[in-house]
Design a protein with these regions (language model features):
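Short, charged, amphipathic alpha-helical segments
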Residues: 66, 93-97, 235-242
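A structural feature that tracks compact, well-ordered secondary-structure segments
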Residues: 82, 94-98, 171-172, 208, ...
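Accessory, usually C-terminal, subdomains that scaffold auxiliary metal cofactors
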Residues: 192-241
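Short alpha-helical hairpin
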Residues: 7-21, 27-58, 73-76
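Acidic, carboxylate-rich catalytic segments that either coordinate divalent cations
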Residues: 4, 214-217, 228-270
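Helix-loop segments that flank and shape redox-cofactor active sites
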Residues: 48-57, 75-97, 177-186
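Active-site-proximal alpha-helical scaffolds that flank and shape metal-associated catalytic sites
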Residues: 23-37, 93-206, 246, 250, ...
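Membrane-entry segments of alpha-helical transmembrane domains in multi-pass membrane proteins
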Residues: 57-65
Length: 270
């Protein structure tokens, strides 16, 4: 059974937001509330891939990590796609700042993706290069590329805002997945000084307070975009934001279903 109620609620909420003629600061707050209140898979506590971890075996979680790596690998290209099409200098500078951190500005010049690839392969046994992805992951990547190659700058900024707004809770969920895999493997923990540990700390950290990298990215992006959004651009911003949130929410649902369907693929080998 699909959870259609959340999508109907999103649709109704979006209609109300688009009809309210809000100032940018109020608009951003309403969009933030959409994530927490309407999109079940974008919250760590209700994401089905997190809530079902206890029922999955090591190979199931490895599959999930491999599939998510496809989005991680593509994300940096989404920023580059946006940068090519952006005409608003302040937003371009913020995208460049985020890209510099992804390329290792805060991790001793080691790109985040390289930390991910090394850690996943050598510490968690997950290969992320030259792999095939499921249809639902390929559909997500195609959908996101289409969104971030749109030349409407307000729409594009809505997409960028959503990518950053969802990042902290999303990566806290990914951290839970990675730690669950490590525990399934050998009962151990991911050390902070391990390659995977460094990768995690490059994205989320609850200590010290206020030092969460993804929260900083979102605050910077929200501020930069605000300089360019006027009332006539509100609705395009909302459309871009909702497009990304809906794509990610539905992917988490679909990939969780995919894990279970793989477990029930009982065809004998030839």
């Amino acid at each position: 059974m699909i959870r259609e109620a959340q999508y109907l609620q999103v649709e109704e909420a979006v209609k109300n937001i688009m009809g309210a003629n809000l100032k940018y600061e109020d608009l951003a707050r309403e969009l933030e509330k959409l994530i927490g209140d309407k999109y079940g898979s974008l919250s760590t506590d209700t994401n089905p891939a997190i809530t079902n971890l206890a029922h999955w075996q090591e190979d199931d979680i490895r599959f999930l990590v491999k599939e998510y790596s496809g989005f991680s690998n593509d994300s940096i290209h989404l920023f580059h796609d946006a940068l090519i099409r952006l005409e608003w200098d302040g937003v371009k500078e913020e995208v460049k700042r985020n890209l510099s951190e992804e390329m290792g500005a805060l991790t001793n010049d080691v790109p985040h993706l390289e930390l991910m690839r090394r850690g996943y392969k050598y510490e968690l046994g997950v290969e992320t290069e030259g792999v095939e992805y499921s249809q639902c992951t390929e559909a997500l990547l195609t959908r996101m590329r289409r969104i971030f190659r749109n030349s409407n700058n307000a729409y594009l900024c809505g997409a960028l805002l959503a990518l950053e707004a969802t990042a902290t809770f999303e990566f806290k969920g990914v951290e839970k997945i990675l730690r669950a895999l490590k525990h399934k493997m050998d009962g151990g923990e991911i050390a902070a000084n391990s390659v995977t540990g460094q990768y995690i700390l490059g994205h989320v950290s609850d200590s010290p307070e206020g030092e969460n990298p993804e929260d900083d990215h979102y605050a910077g992006m929200r501020s930069a975009i605000g300089s360019y959004i006027s009332a006539e651009k509100n609705n395009d911003l909302v459309r871009g934001f909702v497009s990304v949130c809906t794509a990610l929410n539905s992917w988490w649902e679909n990939i969780s279903i995919e894990v279970y369907s793989r477990k029930l693929d009982l065809a004998p080998s030839n």
